[in-house]
């Protein structure tokens, strides 16, 4: 899975790709070609 800063152009790579929001992160998942998986949103800094 790749981590990218913008998934705007990556959501149209295949007709089976779909955008899903889980736990505050955006994912592009593709059932037909799992190599196309990407995630947007990184780790948040925790307060001590």
Swiss-Prot record:
<dbReference type="GO" id="GO:0006412">
    <property type="term" value="P:translation"/>
</dbReference>
<dbReference type="GO" id="GO:1990904">
    <property type="term" value="C:ribonucleoprotein complex"/>
</dbReference>
<keyword id="KW-0150">Chloroplast</keyword>
<dbReference type="InterPro" id="IPR000473">
    <property type="entry name" value="Ribosomal_bL36"/>
</dbReference>
<keyword id="KW-0934">Plastid</keyword>
<keyword id="KW-0689">Ribosomal protein</keyword>
<dbReference type="Pfam" id="PF00444">
    <property type="entry name" value="Ribosomal_L36"/>
</dbReference>
<dbReference type="GO" id="GO:0003735">
    <property type="term" value="F:structural constituent of ribosome"/>
</dbReference>
<protein>
    <recommendedName>
        <fullName>Large ribosomal subunit protein bL36c</fullName>
    </recommendedName>
</protein>
<dbReference type="GO" id="GO:0009507">
    <property type="term" value="C:chloroplast"/>
</dbReference>
<dbReference type="GO" id="GO:0005840">
    <property type="term" value="C:ribosome"/>
</dbReference>
<dbReference type="InterPro" id="IPR035977">
    <property type="entry name" value="Ribosomal_bL36_sp"/>
</dbReference>
<dbReference type="InterPro" id="IPR047621">
    <property type="entry name" value="Ribosomal_L36_bact"/>
</dbReference>
<keyword id="KW-0687">Ribonucleoprotein</keyword>
<comment type="similarity">
    <text>Belongs to the bacterial ribosomal protein bL36 family.</text>
</comment>
